[in-house]
Amino acid sequence: EEVGDAVKNIKVGDKVIISCVSKCCTCDNCKIQLYSHCRNGGWILGYMIDGTQAEYVRTPYADNSLVPLPDNVNEEVALLLSDALPTAHEIGVQYGDVKPGDTVFIAGAGPVGMSALLTAQLYSPAAIIVCDMDENRLKLAKELGATHTINPASGDVSKQVAAIVDEDGVDCAIEAAGIPATWNMCQDIVKPGGHIA
C-alpha cells in the first residue's frame, strides 16, 4: 500500500517476495555476495526489527531485498521462496556439503526439513533419511523423495541409521527441528569427517 521515498524499483501494487536477508549491496560483504553478513542489513528481519509474517511489513533496502513476483507464479508456491527453501538449501544442503553419492539425514520434517529434502535431491545423494515423530509428515517425505524415514518412537535412531547406511554414519546430518535432542541425534549419527548443518 505504500513504498518509501528511497525505493525506486518497486511500486505500490507490485507482488513481491521478501528476502529473509536484507542487503544494502554497497558494503564489502555484499560486494562478494555474502548478503547474510551485510554490515547494514543481513539477518535483521524478525530479530532487530519486526518479521515478515504480517499483513504490513517494513523492508529495509527494499530495492535490493524485494524480488518482483511474475504474475504466472502461484502465491502459495512463492511463499516457500522467501525463507524456508533458501534457508534449507544454503544452511542445510550447501553448508552440509551434500555431494553425489552421499548419505543425508534430516532431523525434522517441517517446512525447513521438507525444503532440505527437496533441495538435497539436486545433488544426487545415494540416500536421504528423514526423521520425525509425525507419521503424516514421514509419509509426505517419502512421496517427496526420501529413500528412508524414521520415527524416533520406533526405537534407537542411531541403530536404525546404521542399518540403512553403515556403522560409520551419514555423510551429512541436517538439523531442521531446532531442539537440543535433534542436535544431539545429528552428532550421534554423522560419520567422522562428516558434516552437521
Language-model features, listed with the residues they occupy:
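Glycine-rich beta-strand-centered segment in the early N-terminal region that forms part
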Residues: E1-D28, P70-N72
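Conserved amphipathic alpha-helix within the SDR
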Residues: V157-E167
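N-terminal Rossmann-like NAD(P) cofactor-binding module of classical short-chain dehydrogenase/reductase
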Residues: I17, D171-I174
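Mid-domain Rossmann-like dinucleotide-binding core that forms the NAD(H)/NADP(H) cofactor-binding site
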Residues: D71-G155, K159, G193
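NAD(P)H dinucleotide-binding glycine-rich loop of Rossmann-like/cofactor-binding domains
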Residues: C24-A107
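ADP-ribose/adenylate-binding Rossmann-like module
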Residues: D188-A197
